[in-house]
Amino acid sequence: MGVDIVDVSSGGNLHNAPIKAVPGFQIPFAEAIRAKAGIPTTAVGLITEAKQADEIVSSGKADAVFLARAMIRNPRWAMAAAEELGVKIDWPLQFDRGRTLN
């Protein structure tokens, strides 16, 4: 038994915490834990753009990104991100017919 991946977040529970909530503000925490502990991490914190998420993973700052607000705003975010990045993915059959309408 062990840990497969660590979801790194500063929590955001204190209104007066000295951390500014700007796009990617939690990434340095994930990057530091990944480097020092040698364990895969996920990055969170106002990650909203496909290229931003791709850069985080491809540069080794984190092994994955977790999205909340972006997925609430657009439940098909992953499909749109794949298209933006030129990655061909299989769409769920339920969505496939709607893909060509836009």
What are these regions (language model features)?
Residues 1-102:
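Flavin-dependent oxidoreductase catalytic cores
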